[in-house]
Structures are given as C-alpha cells and as structure tokens.
C-alpha cells in the first residue's frame, strides 16, 4: 500500500475513533458553541477526561513518529505495556503540574541542499498535546476561513490547487501576489498567538498557561546545546499545525474582508449544490474595493486579483500587515507579483499558468489554468527514484530485492497520487521516466529474449498479487511495465491525470450531516455497548492499555459478533483471546487478538476428550466455524479436532499433523 493511501485510511479512521470513545458528541457541541460565539473557560475538564486521554492514545499510537524516541528515549512501545489506570494517572499528574521535557531537534535535509529543523517532543508531551488538540480543533474549525486548506481535517493540497484553478478559469483573475514568510514556524510571536487564542474564545487560563509552556519548551540541539525559544512553534509538535493556522487565520479574514466577505448594504447570496456559498458582486463593484481572493496552505499562500495596479497595492499592503501585525519577517527575494498569462507561479510543488483556450461567448480570448509538476519537484523525485534503483541493484538476495522493488513502486504511486491533478503531468514525467528505465536496463541483470520465466529484467511477466495499487497499472494494456524477479516495476510516466476537486463545504467532521459524507456512522454496534466496554476495561493480571484499546476496536470491527461462531456476543460472556499465546510473544497488538464466546475460548485451549466433546455438543459448530476454530487451536499449540473420532463433517485446515487424534 502506498503512503498516500495509508495516510487517507488513517485520517478516515481518526474520524471515527471519537465515536469509539464517546467523544464525538462533546466535540460537536464545542463546534456549535464556537459558531455561536461562546467563550470557553473550563476546557481542562474535557481535556483531562478519561475518554479524551484514551482517545489521544489511540490517535497517536500508530503514527510513525510514535516509534521515534526523544531526549528521554521513550517510545510508544513503553506506554503500550502500561495498564489503563497507570496511563491515566500519569497523564493526569503531568497536567496537574505540567513541565514539558526538552524537545530533541534534528536537521532534516531539503531538496535544495539546505536543512530544516524538526522538533521531536517526548512521547508524554505528544500525548498531552494530542489531548489538547482534540478539544481545540472543533473550536478553531468553527472560526477558520474556508480558503485555508493546510493541516485541517478533510482538506488537502488538491482542494487548494482546485481553488487556484477556479480563480483562473472562472473568476478570470490573472495576477498573483506571492509573499514569502521567512522561516514562519520559527518566527511565530508568542504574545500575539496567545491573544489570538483568547479572541477565538479559548479563555481557560490554566490551558493557556500550559500552551505557553509548550511553546517555550527547551530545545536540545544535535550537539547537545540547550536553547530556550522566545518565539516560534516547534516543527514536529502535534499542536504546531493548528497553532500556525490560528496565527494566520487573522490574515485570512483580513484579506477576505477586503472583498469576498466585505459587508454591503444589499447582500445577494446564493448556495450551490456542493454547499458552497457565493454571492453576486454587483454591490461590491459599485465600491472602490479591489477584488482579491486568498488561497492558503499553512504558510504558503496566493492572492489572486484582476490587474497589475491592484496586485502592486496588495503586495505592499500584505508585506506591511504581516510585518507590523503578526511580527513576521518577509523574504524580499522570494516575494513577487506574477502575471499568469506571461509567467508561471509555483504552488505546493506545482506550477500554475494561464494559457489561451478559445474564445468566450462575446468573442474575448478565454484563458484556462495549465498546471505542471514543478521542475524542483521533478528533480527531487528523479534523484530519490534513481537512488532506489541502486538499492534494488545492490540487494544481496531475491527476498530483499522484491522488498526494494515494492518500495520503488510505492514511491511511484505516491508521486502519481499527489501530482495526477496536474494537467500536463504525463509530459512532465515522460523524459524522466525513460531516463530511469534506461538506468534500470544498465544496472539490472538481463533476461533472454522472449523468456517469460526469467528472473532478469524483462518486459514479459504477469502480476498475481492483490495489491490494488499495483493491479490498476497491470490491468492497463501498455508498454510501460517491466519485471525483475517476476515482480512488476512501474513506470514513472505511466500516469493518467484527473481534474482536482473543490472542497465540499458540507463535509464536516463536527456535524452529523457532514460526517455522513466522510464515512457511515457506526450502526451495527450501539453506543450503549461501546460505553459498557469503556467503563469495564480489563484491569486484572497483565491487561495493558494497548490490550483494552484493541478490544474496543475489535468489537466494532467484528460488529459485536464472535469471530468463530458469527453469533452476537454477550458482553458478560466475551473473551479477548491472544491468537499466539501472550507468554510466548507478549503481543497485545490488534492482529494478535480476537473476540470470542467463553465456550469457544475453552474449546481452543481444551485438551481432554470429554471437555472437547461436551463443548462441541453445546456449541453445535458448522464446518466453517470448525475451520476457524482449528486455526486458533494450532496457533496455541493444540491439534486440530479429529474428524473421525467426533463424527463431524469437518476437515483440518492449513496445518496437518502425522497423528491428529486427541484421544
């Protein structure tokens, strides 16, 4: 599975995790109250609640960063082994007297040869930040401008590019104002940010003190030096993207109020099928206001307008406003005004340009957006793929070779998934794709002509796997795909572009109607059942927070039914079974657990003839259930149930023994 698909699935899952822990109604209420302009002075009660803390654990436990240690060397694996009570007490104690640990800073290489700083807070601080984020996000989402697309739920770079294209294609705004904020994340003014949070209605003083401490957490550089920041938000912190949007939200609305949301005596509003609100600008056109629209993705933004004169005035005003109002430094070299009819403008790894496309109804020249993968992005992609080809060449055995090929394919699919919305992507990648294929031909072992059974580099082969990301390429009848070790290697230029889709404003994770457009609500499992499971965790013996969290997930995934019999589970008669015994692996992962009836659990571990017969008679299992049961028995070290001795129409699945009798 490629990286973009994994991210999308993770986001979809996060949207429903709040339902698992009964927090969705709380977040919905915060969103409604924020929309109504209410003030929030007692948020810490929600932030430190049991369900919010456990939801925070679930949201971060599978993030790749959770396995990256900070200064204290603790990773998620340490916390997984704690009991639920231990985790809750630890978090509550840290909130009561919060002092952030040092943030470990690493320098990450950039494509231009420079580096950017990445802060790695301790895992305890990440959990604290996640608890806060979950509560602040619905409040802030209600106040954020609709033209902001970065680091927000159910918004993406595709929506930003679609909006930029719309400004060119439909609004006919051909001048773009680019103002580059120099080192934005390192320059955010703490005092200004605290005031902005207060203005948004976040007025819980205990929470604001904690947020100030998070911003001022000491940073440990790679050489061991400790730095105490006076400005900026740590890149890598869970709260940083939200705080960045809070800081620039004031700027979004300032631009918006110049034209798009400017108040006039008469309002001519309308709403289209997608839920987007628009208005007839006839009243605005009678004023001296200058038409302008912002499209922002975190700190990267474009301001579209109609004339160079307007663009020059906006350019100066924006620089002055950002420097004086937000105390943010501007990079003069990277800031400019662009006429899209004559020059390209880079945005989020794409280049935008307006090209002639026929005539309008009144005979005027019509312009349409032409988008490409930016030269910088192409160069970076080519370098990374070329490096991966070398890794494939140097693999010591076929098993590792296939893994490296899979990684190469994942990189190709990731590039395609992100850049497929460019109108001319195929042309952009054609030359680079053939250069990479030539490199493969020179580096990989060759095959004999027309040899379909070779392990060498060849155009002949057949993919028999089930990876949907690969299947969609192999189904196409084209000349692009090559094979090595009988594994397909995708071609960079084998891509089909699609039109970027605008964000539907009706999609909203904090309204019931909006969530229906994201995913189906949990219908097979009631909130009463989930509440019982949350209120009755397994606390005795070796039960961990990971065990209880996965127990809840499995109940939803199995629709509240036994994984062997398929019958509805009785919550008082349910067992959460380790497929491979805990004493062997100490593994409480989701993959190693399953929910079953207590009698099925006894039957999995039973070795005595009388016990097995009695349980089989009581359960009356069918053939499919026996197959599932046998798989679980084999995993715990027991034999499959003997077909002849029990006079049952069953067979032993997957693993057979020389002597199967239990008696």
Please name every model-derived segment:
Residues 99-111, 212-229, 387, 406-411, ...:
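Active-site-adjacent bridging/hinge elements
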Residues 87, 95, 102, 143-147, ...:
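Conserved polymerase palm-domain catalytic core
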């Amino acid at each position: 599975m490629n990286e973009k698909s994994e991210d999308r699935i993770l986001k979809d899952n996060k949207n429903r995790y709040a339902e698992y822990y009964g927090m969705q109604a709380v977040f919905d209420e915060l969103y409604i109250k924020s929309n109504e302009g209410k003030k929030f002075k007692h948020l810490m009660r929600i932030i430190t609640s049991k369900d919010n803390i456990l939801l925070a654990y679930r949201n971060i436990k599978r993030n790749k960063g959770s396995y990256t240690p900070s200064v204290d060397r603790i990773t998620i694996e340490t916390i997984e082994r704690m009991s639920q009570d231990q985790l809750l007490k630890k978090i509550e104690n840290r909130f009561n007297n919060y002092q952030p640990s040092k943030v470990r800073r690493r320098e990450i290489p950039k494509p231009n040869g420079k580096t950017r700083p990445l802060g790695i807070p301790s895992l305890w601080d990440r959990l604290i930040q996640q608890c806060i984020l979950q509560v602040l996000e619905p409040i802030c989402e209600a106040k954020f401008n609709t033209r902001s697309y970065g680091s927000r739920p159910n918004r993406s770079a595709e929506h930003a590019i679609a909006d930029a294209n719309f400004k060119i294609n439909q609004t006919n705004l051909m001048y773009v104002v680019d103002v580059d904020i120099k080192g934005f994340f390192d320059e955010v003014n703490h005092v200004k940010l605290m005031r902005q949070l207060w203005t948004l209605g976040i007025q819980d003083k205990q929470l604001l003190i904690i947020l100030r401490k998070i911003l001022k957490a000491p940073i440990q550089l790679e050489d061991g030096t400790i730095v105490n920041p006076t400005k900026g938000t740590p890149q890598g912190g869970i709260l940083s993207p939200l705080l960045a949007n809070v800081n620039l939200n004031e700027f979004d609305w300032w631009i918006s109020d110049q034209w798009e949301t400017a108040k006039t005596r008469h309002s001519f509003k309308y709403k289209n099928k997608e839920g987007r609100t628009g208005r007839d600008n006839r009243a605005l056109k009678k004023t001296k206001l200058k038409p302008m629209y912002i499209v922002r993705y975190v700190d990267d933004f474009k301001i579209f307008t109609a004339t160079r004169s307007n663009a020059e005035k906006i350019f100066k005003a924006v620089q002055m406003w950002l420097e004086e109002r937000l105390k943010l430094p501007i990079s003069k070299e990277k800031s400019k005004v662009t006429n899209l009819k004559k020059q390209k403008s880079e945005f989020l790894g794409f280049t935008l340009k307006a090209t002639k496309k026929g005539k309008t109804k009144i005979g005027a020249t019509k312009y349409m957006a032409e988008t490409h993968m930016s030269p910088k992005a192409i160069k970076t992609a080519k370098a990374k793929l070329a490096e991966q080809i070398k890794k494939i060449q140097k693999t010591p055995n076929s098993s590792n070779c296939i893994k490296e090929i899979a990684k190469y394919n994942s990189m190709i699919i990731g590039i395609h998934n992100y850049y497929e919305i460019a109108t001319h992507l195929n042309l952009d990648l054609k030359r680079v794709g053939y250069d990479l294929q030539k490199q493969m031909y020179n580096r990989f072992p060759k095959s004999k002509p027309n040899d379909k059974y070779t392990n060498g580099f060849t155009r002949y082969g057949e993919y028999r796997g089930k990876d949907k990301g690969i299947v969609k390429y192999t189904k196409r009848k084209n000349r692009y795909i090559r094979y090595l070790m009988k594994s397909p290697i995708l071609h960079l230029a084998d891509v089909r572009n699609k039109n970027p889709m605008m964000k539907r404003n009706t999609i909203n994770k904090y309204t019931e109607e909006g969530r229906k457009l994201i995913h189906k609500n949990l219908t097979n499992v009631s909130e009463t059942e989930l509440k019982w499971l949350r209120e009755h965790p397994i606390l005795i013996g070796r039960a961990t927070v990971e065990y209880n969290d996965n127990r809840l997930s499995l109940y939803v995934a199995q629709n509240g039914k036994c994984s062997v019999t398929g019958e509805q589970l009785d919550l008082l008669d349910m067992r959460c079974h380790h497929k491979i015994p805990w004493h062997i692996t100490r593994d409480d992962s989701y993959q190693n657990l399953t929910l079953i009836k207590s009698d099925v659990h006894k039957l999995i571990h039973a070795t005595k003839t009388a016990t097995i017969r009695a349980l089989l008679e009581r359960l009356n299992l069918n053939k499919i259930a026996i197959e599932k049961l046998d798989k679980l028995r084999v995993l715990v070290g027991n034999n499959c149930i003997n077909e002849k001795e029990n006079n049952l129409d069953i067979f032993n699945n997957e693993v057979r023994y020389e002597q199967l009798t239990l008696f």
